[in-house]
Structures are given as structure tokens and as C-alpha cells.
């Protein structure tokens, strides 16, 4: 067996580990699971650390398991939260589970023989257990004192903790015990905030099944500036292209700070230690070229999305930073085009105007209600100075007839000066 724990150590992915875990893994092919919250139809980059733990676990010859918390997701884990979550319907949870499964197939091999990955949903066993039965079989094994001592409970006591949330660690512990008995699972992994819940499981296994199980956690990532990893100014960075475009996804990684990127490339790629150290040496010679950031962004964008999406993100970046040609602009799909130019003025125009063959001067002044240029005089002056382009083609004459192929048969991109863009949409 490859040494899974050593792999996590050099990558900076190990926080806490129960004594005996490393030795057990070296001697036994083991099944380990990580729980995923199905309260959304997509995972976020905040889930990537634990996903990568499962990836390394599988590469070490072990069996990775993803548990979708269909039952516990109806309640919500109080760990790291200051308020109670909203409950979700079973139908919504099932839809979310399917979305999560599709995303995990990009990282884990579910059909590779003896150590194929597995996916389970804890609703499948909890739905058949009655409240009295659960109290009798599981509740009697953990004392209230034991449960109250957990950090996830302590931190919420001052602001209020419902009995439902208080029971969460018992439910998660029961998951571990169920999987220990039915699926031969011996290890649960998660973020460091899950240590209390995971060890509740090992304790329940000891008491209910007279068995020994193990726990391992990874650090909760923060960025060098102290902010939480996994979010941008606009909110969550999702793995689903419909929620976060591949362009924005790529840009998030490309914008990693120099103080963060060495950690990130160890955690989020499968590059070897030697390859990473060689890249770091090369990066140090010319940090402004951002070699580490580009390598990281390429690797993770291709894995989560596709090579085509990565190429599209590159073209989109070049368009914004002035290195592109018209062909690059025409190659963008609508999702990328709108993502790249999100926030710029989007001006709706009747398509019939094009049949009248207007001049560039008219289009950029009166026909766009003076939104691009307030007057024809100002438009004429900037065009004469070479400061206006349409679809990356410089306008040489204000009397030129508008006869440019529409992007995606709908749009014209107007650039005024170096930084001012306008998107015209013809309806």
C-alpha cells in the first residue's frame, strides 16, 4: 500500500489523526468515507479539499466512499454555523444527490475493480428507523455530558441550539457505525471542524459494535489575507458551470495570491512533490509571469470542466486584457461572453435597425440613446483618434456603415478607450 498519510503530510492536508490510523492503513486495504451536504445541487470549491483526500486515498489503493447526507441534510450540522438551516424536501435532496454524484465522477473512479469508489445516502437507512428504536439502539450509548463537550455544541449554546441540531452528532455517529457494520468502513475523514462528530462515531462503534475505527481530518483553509477559502466577492465558487462559469472558475484560481498558491497547488493538483518544487523554482525567477497560478488554474479547470472550457477561459482572459483578435471573440460561447462582460452596460436594440444600414456614428450615439456617447461630436472625435472598436475591429471612419457579423448572431461588442466596454444586443 502507498503511504496515504505521508502523502497528506507533504501536501499540507493533515490536521488531526487518531493514533493507530497510519499503521492500520499500511497493513489493510480500507474503506473510508467523507460526508457531503446535499443542501445544494452542486458542490463548491470549499468541498475540494476533502474530495482530494478521497482521490489520494483511492490512488493509495484504498476504497473511497462519498456519503450524501440525505437524512442529516434535512436537519443541518451546527458545526461552524451560527443559525439553524432550512429543511429540504426529499425530492430536492434526491436531485441534489444526483448533481453531486456527477461532479464526483470527475475525481473518483467508480468502476476500477477492487478499489472502486462508492456513493451512499444515509436517508436509505434512516428512513426505516423509528424515533423510539433509534433512542433505544443508539441514544443510550452517548451521554449528554459527552455530547455537550463538543466544540460544535459549545459554540452554539450561547445563541441557542435546537434539540434537532444537538442530535446531529449522534446521527452522524450512527452513520459511521452503520457503515462499519454493513460496508466494512473503518475510517471517516473530513474538515477539522468535523473532529467532534467523527469521534462520536468511533465512540459509538466502540460501544455498539465493540469495534475499533479511525478518524482523520484536514485543515480548514484560509487565504493569506485571513478570509475564508472557497468564496469570492460574489459568493460561492460552484463546481457546476451553470452556477459559476468556467471563465470565473478559472479566474478565481488564476488570481491566487503568491502567498497562497504554493499551498493550493499541493492540495488541489496531483502533481508530484518534485514537479511542484521545480515549478516553484521557475516561478521564483519571474513571479510576474504567474507560472504557479497558471498551472494551478489550468489543472483544476480542466478536471472540473473540460479542456475546451479551459481554452475558452484563456481566450476570454486575452479579450479582457487586450491581447486578443476578432476570431477569439467570435469563438466564445454565450455563457462565457456574458460572464466575461458581466457588469458592463448591456444595451438592447431592435434588430430592424440593422436593415436601415446605419452609420457607426448614428449607432453609437442616437440609436443607443446616447448610452455609449452622449453626442455625435464626442463620438466623432474619439473615432478619429482611433479610440473606438467594434468586435475588436478598430473603426477608422465615423461614416462607416455598420456591417459587422453579430457575435452569436445577437451581439456587438463596443470598446471605447482602453477600459470602457458596451455590449449591444439585437432583438
UniProtKB/Swiss-Prot annotation:
Q: Which stretch carries the motif 'HIGH' region?
A: 38-47
Q: Which GO terms describe its molecular function?
A: ATP binding; RNA binding; tyrosine-tRNA ligase activity
InterPro entries for this protein:
aa-tRNA-synth_Ic, Rossmann-like_a/b/a_fold, S4_RNA-bd_sf, SYY-like_C, Tyr-tRNA-ligase, Tyr-tRNA-ligase_bac-type, Tyr-tRNA-ligase_bac_1
Question: Superkingdom, according to UniProt?
Answer: Bacteria
Q: Where is this motif: 'KMSKS' region?
A: 228-232
Q: Where does L-tyrosine bind?
A: 33, 168, 172
Any one GO BP annotation for this protein: tyrosyl-tRNA aminoacylation
Q: Which UniProt keywords apply?
A: Aminoacyl-tRNA synthetase, ATP-binding, Cytoplasm, Ligase, Nucleotide-binding, Protein biosynthesis, RNA-binding
Subcellular location as annotated: Cytoplasm
Q: GO cellular-component terms in the record? A: cytosol
**Catalytic class of the enzyme:** ligase
| Enzymatic reactions | tRNA(Tyr) + L-tyrosine + ATP = L-tyrosyl-tRNA(Tyr) + AMP + diphosphate + H(+)
Query: What EC number(s) does the entry state?
Result: 6.1.1.1
Q: How does it assemble?
A: Homodimer.
Q: Which family does it belong to?
A: Belongs to the class-I aminoacyl-tRNA synthetase family. TyrS type 1 subfamily.
**NCBIfam families attached to this UniProt entry:** tyrS
| Name under which the protein is recorded | Tyrosine--tRNA ligase
Tell me what organism the protein belongs to. Cytophaga hutchinsonii (strain ATCC 33406 / DSM 1761 / CIP 103989 / NBRC 15051 / NCIMB 9469 / D465)
**What gene is this protein translated from?**
tyrS
Amino acid at each position: 500500500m502507498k503511504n496515504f498519510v505521508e502523502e497528506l503530510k507533504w501536501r499540507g492536508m493533515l490536521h488531526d489523526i487518531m493514533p493507530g490510523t497510519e499503521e492500520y492503513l499500511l497493513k489493510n486495504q480500507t474503506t473510508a468515507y467523507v460526508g457531503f451536504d446535499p443542501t445544494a445541487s452542486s458542490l463548491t470549491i470549499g468541498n475540494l479539499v476533502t474530495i482530494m483526500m478521497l482521490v489520494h486515498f483511492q490512488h493509495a489503493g484504498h476504497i473511497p466512499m462519498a456519503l450524501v447526507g440525505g437524512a442529516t441534510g434535512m436537519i443541518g450540522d451546527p458545526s461552524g454555523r451560527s443559525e439553524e438551516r432550512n429543511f429540504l424536501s426529499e425530492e430536492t435532496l434526491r436531485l441534489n444527490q444526483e448533481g453531486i454524484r456527477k461532479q464526483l465522477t470527475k475525481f473518483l473512479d467508480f468502476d476500477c475493480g477492487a478499489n472502486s469508489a462508492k456513493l451512499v445516502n444515509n436517508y436509505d437507512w434512516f428512513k426505516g428507523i423509528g424515533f423510539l428504536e433509534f433512542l433505544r439502539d443508539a441514544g443510550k450509548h452517548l451521554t449528554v455530558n459527552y455530547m455537550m463537550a463538543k466544540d460544535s455544541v459549545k459554540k452554539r449554546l450561547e445563541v441557542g441550539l435546537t434539540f434537532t441540531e444537538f442530535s446531529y452528532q449522534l446521527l452522524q455517529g450512527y452513520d459511521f457505525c452503520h457503515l462499519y457494520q454493513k460496508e466494512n468502513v473503518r475510517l471517516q475523514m473530513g474538515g477539522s471542524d468535523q473532529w467532534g462528530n467523527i469521534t462520536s462515531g468511533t465512540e459509538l462503534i466502540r460501544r455498539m459494535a465493540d469495534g475499533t475505527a479511525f478518524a482523520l481530518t484536514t485543515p480548514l483553509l484560509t487565504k493569506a489575507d485571513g478570509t475564508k477559502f472557497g468564496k469570492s466577492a460574489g459568493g460561492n465558487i460552484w463546481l457546476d458551470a451553470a452556477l459559476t462559469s468556467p471563465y470565473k472558475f478559472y479566474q478565481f484560481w488564476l488570481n491566487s495570491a503568491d502567498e497562497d498558491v504554493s499551498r493550493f497547488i499541493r492540495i488541489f493538483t496531483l502533481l508530484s512533490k518534485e514537479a511542484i518544487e521545480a515549478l516553484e523554482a521557475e516561478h521564483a525567477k519571474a513571479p510576474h509571469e504567474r507560472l504557479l497560478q497558471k498551472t494551478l488554474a489550468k489543472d483544476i479547470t480542466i478536471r472540473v470542466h473540460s479542456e475546451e472550457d479551459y481554452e475558452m477561459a484563456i481566450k476570454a482572459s486575452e479579450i479582457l486584457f487586450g491581447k486578443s483578435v476578432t476570431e477569439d471573440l467570435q469563438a466564445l460561447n454565450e455563457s462565457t461572453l456574458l460572464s466575461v462582460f458581466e457588469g458592463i452596460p448591456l444595451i438592447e436594440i431592435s434588430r430592424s435597425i440593422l436593415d436601415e444600414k446605419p452609420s457607426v456614428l448614428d449607432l453609437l450615439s442616437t440609436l443607443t440613446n446616447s448610452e455609449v456617447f452622449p453626442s455625435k461630436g464626442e463620438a466623432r472625435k474619439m473615432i478619429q483618434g482611433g479610440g473606438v472598436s467594434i468586435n475588436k475591429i478598430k473603426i477608422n471612419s465615423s461614416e462607416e456603415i455598420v456591417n459587422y457579423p453579430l457575435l452569436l448572431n445577437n451581439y456587438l461588442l463596443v470598446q471605447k478607450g482602453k477600459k470602457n466596454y458596451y455590449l449591444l444586443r439585437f432583438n
